[in-house]
Amino acid sequence: MPVARSWVCRKTYVTPRRPFEKSRLDQELKLIGEYGLRNKREVWRVKFTLAKIRKAARELLTLDEKDPRRLFEGNALLRRLVRIGVLDEGKMKLDYILGLKIEDFLERRLQTQVFKLGLAKSIHHARVLIRQRHIRVRKQVVNIPSFIVRLDSQKHIDFSLRSPYGGGRPGRVKRKNAKKGQGGAGAGDDEEED
């Protein structure tokens, strides 16, 4: 007998109020092209995350500066944003959170970082490499293009050890050509002996 499961989940994005606003459509399309996103939902998801962070910062700014909640939660929020590389260490104030843009978060995606490091020929190639499990962060293979790369993990992005790009087993075509090369050389020797 099947067991009924209740999934606890919430929406990770909010659709725009005005569906056909030309300026917004153009801006979203530009972001999709620049950062190699799959669809508008990926833009909306980042926008939603940014909105939640800014809302938290605005709420904390309404409290008194010496308020323990503002000190504790404000520092936690700032540290988190600095750790993922969205905010500079010199700008560790709540006011700077309100000035963050979507591009700041899109720059920290694994897909963008792989392209910027020169591991991929284009932003779209970076997405393919990640999905095909060729990229690792530290020792962990990551196959999610939207993975947010922390500042300390940025220098540890590299090809997977099992990937043909990273010195692992050669790919299908390379193996086929190598086999053909060995077989061709062996066949040529036999003909000369006869």
From Swiss-Prot:
GO terms for cellular component: cytoplasm; cytosol; cytosolic ribosome; cytosolic small ribosomal subunit; extracellular exosome; focal adhesion; membrane; nucleolus. Keywords: Acetylation, Cytoplasm, Isopeptide bond, Nucleus, Phosphoprotein, Ribonucleoprotein, Ribosomal protein, RNA-binding, rRNA-binding, Ubl conjugation. Its main location: cytoplasm. The modification N6-acetyllysine is found at K66, K116, K155. It comes from the Eukaryota. One of its GO terms (biological process) is ribosomal small subunit biogenesis. Residues 162-194 are annotated as: Disordered. GO terms for molecular function: RNA binding; rRNA binding; structural constituent of ribosome; translation regulator activity. It is found in: Cytoplasm; Nucleus, Nucleolus. Residues 108-182 form the S4 RNA-binding domain. Component of the small ribosomal subunit. The ribosome is a large ribonucleoprotein complex responsible for the synthesis of proteins in the cell. Part of the small subunit (SSU) processome, first precursor of the small eukaryotic ribosomal subunit. During the assembly of the SSU processome in the nucleolus, many ribosome biogenesis factors, an RNA chaperone and ribosomal proteins associate with the nascent pre-rRNA and work in concert to generate RNA folding, modifications, rearrangements and cleavage as well as targeted degradation of pre-ribosomal RNA by the RNA exosome. Belongs to the universal ribosomal protein uS4 family. PANTHER family: 30S 40S RIBOSOMAL PROTEIN, SMALL RIBOSOMAL SUBUNIT PROTEIN US4. NCBIfam families: PRK04051.1, uS4_arch. This is Small ribosomal subunit protein uS4. It comes from Homo sapiens (Human).
